[in-house]
Amino acid sequence: MEVLESGEQSVLQWDRKLSELSEPGETEALMYHTHFSELLDEFSQNVLGQLLSDPFLSEKSESMEVEPSPTSPAPLIQAEHSYSLSEEPRTQSPFTHAATSDSFNDEEVESEKWYLSTEFPSATIKTEPITEEQPPGLVPSVTLTITAISTPFEKEESPLDMNAGGDSSCQTLIPKIKLEPHEVDQFLNFSPKEASVDQLHLPPTPPSSHSSDSEGSLSPNPRLHPFSLSQAHSPARAMPRGPSALSTSPLLTAPHKLQGSGPLVLTEEEKRTLVAEGYPIPTKLPLTKSEEKALKKIRRKIKNKISAQESRRKKKEYMDSLEKKVESCSTENLELRKKVEVLENTNRTLLQQLQKLQTLVMGKVSRTCKLAGTQTGTCLMVVVLCFAVAFGSFFQGYGPYPSATKMALPSQHPLSEPYTASVVRSRNLLIYEEHAPLEESSSPASAGELGGWDRGSSLLRASSGLEALPEVDLPHFLISNETSLEKSVLLELQQHLVSSKLEGNETLKVVELERRVNATF
């Protein structure tokens, strides 16, 4: 954007929030309801592509470098190109792009004739979108309000106007323009045959602060326009349109109209921009070099405003999308956190239940092991007892102390004893001399001896304290060479010896005696 002119430099100050502060209803109350496409019927399809050959946008001829006439006043150029300041309520106006590569044709200049009117009535153009979607190649809706204001024209009149006998003062229009951003790419790479004129929608101009631009040329007390369309409502007002909207837009004059000779008809946007910048409005063709330069400059500024507003709109949309993503991510994060908390609580409860089950299982296993060990020990003890009983019955005939008994036998039963008496029912071996024959005639003595034996047996039982056992009839053998008295004494002594021995180990002696008897027979 060109911001320097006549050695003066200024700072661009864009009021980007004006379009977001106003209400759409207030602006619509000030506008007519004539559709924007109805004003474009005067353009034919052959004129749609003529904007690409505009010499005032791309051609840098040597004639442009010539200084303007000294008789013409110095243009009042401001740094800000926001042209929305006026004492009357302002609305949005449409505008468009023009191609940067144009060519100037002298034949078209001579063939075309155009008229110029010095007074322009107040007009308002309003376009409403039909759908909310904006496919690629679309531009936003625009509303244009043009207000006729009487301003002195003598200081801004060019030499061409003076030679043509223009009036000293006339009414000039100061249109106000408001934009809302839309895609810059929608204004480029288009074909006139791709869309019709009925689908035309123009983007609004960016928010502006006109005080910096027209501070020297307009009112000394500028005030901001209180009405502007909200940017939030712009996407809803978007309407599909063809790429031929730029070539048919009234914001820029068609290139073929700037050629030839005759009256010059400029668009309201161009006139408003020229007045806001302090340039005189050309009325006749051909244009002077200064007029061509000024017209080229204001057309370039219109393009720059479009690109700036589009960049802001894209940024706004991008930020809105990011905010929506952040909100969705935040809600999803909260939901996931809640789910994680629920899962953690469930995990804790499951762990507690698992620990309880483990303790129960370990207790049961330990009890089972203890019971199994106890049962095993009991079984082993029973088996050992069974073996002990079995082997005890098998070795009952040998006794627990066979060697000790055998060693004690010689002392218990000396060889000098003629015979041994037993207290149990058994057989006793009587020792006698074979060379002494037995006398069978001594039966009475035998009877007396048997009586003595019986008395000895009863005495033995009484002294030993044993249970009463049936008396055993022992045969008595009489040696022929001994007397009855000697026999009785021997029997008593033997009985006394046996009773004294049995007092120490009664059971052992009885078993031993029985064993000896059994072994003998």
UniProtKB/Swiss-Prot annotation:
Q: Where is this region: Disordered?
A: 83-106, 196-264
What gene is behind this protein? Creb3l2
Phenotype when changing R427A: Loss of S1P cleavage
Topology relative to the membrane = Single-pass type II membrane protein
SMART domains of this UniProt entry? BRLZ
Its tissue distribution reads:
Widely expressed, including in lung, bladder, ovary, testis and spleen. Highly expressed in chondrocytes.
What name does this protein carry?
Cyclic AMP-responsive element-binding protein 3-like protein 2
Q: Where is this motif: S1P recognition?
A: 427-430
Q: Which residues are glycosylated?
A: N481, N505, N518
Task: Give the organism, scientific name.
Answer: Mus musculus (Mouse)
